[in-house]
């Protein structure tokens, strides 16, 4: 028995429309569907919003291939560095490739020569997050020169990422660095796509040639903001296995918690292997097992027992973020799409 994840594609499209309203007509909308669209199913999500966005972004080569094989023929940007063994396939599939070092750049160029193809490159620039990207304008300029001189490489863009978009000082510092990089890249190609904003930057009304929208697609925000209205698109239900009576001073499942009085407990087919934390404070009788939970107040519907309709609430209980809850919540769930 699998859990059931009901995913509302109409609400997904509405979220996209709402985000789009705050963008200028010339700003490109890049839908981030990495990690299986944050647990929502990348092929279905991408095809549902295909006509409403300009391109897609993924983290891994395999994720890009999955989109291509599902019929997505729009641009796909791979956000993270490629393994050297993946370069040949990435060139063949015509993905946009992110690069921040000469070794990778030269290997891509060599593979393009073998295949007699060209590859579009987005150079990664570090504006303060200190994760990926070259650190200086000098390095960025050297990479740009190499791309520009190559008959097999196209300087299609440059990008960075805000590490702390809620902090105005950090964000302003990053913007200033990015502007210098933007001016450098535009000097080589004034049509290059330069992008800094993900969902957090978008909520701060930081534009650019393109915005990369991830968590907002799925109805959540990286921090509180009234800039745009989005709603969650997924609810997860677990099958009810049985209901049993626990007498006073008895316990159920693992843990030392015992019943204060005789009470009814519902056992549902949902455990920490399904991506839900062992210790959830809201309605569990005791700690979750790997595959089963004991629920004190189960409302069994024709879909099963609702175990998640708001990832923010669970994230608060777990001491984590909605992103982590979402990507884990459909590990063992059948995805059911509402058109």
How should these model regions be labeled?
Residues 60, 101-102, 125, 162, ...:
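Short secondary-structure boundary segments
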Residues 1-96, 109, 154, 336-339:
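A charged N-terminal "starter" segment
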Residues 2-8, 13, 82, 102-103, ...:
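Active-site anion/phosphate-binding pocket segments in diverse small-molecule metabolic enzymes
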Residues 73-82, 96-100, 118-124, 211-212:
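Short hydrophobic/aromatic-enriched beta-strand-loop microsegments
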Residues 31, 123, 268-270:
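Preference for bulky hydrophobic residues occupying beta-strand positions
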Residues 21, 35-48, 91-93, 105-111, ...:
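Active-site loop/helix belt of alpha/beta enzymes
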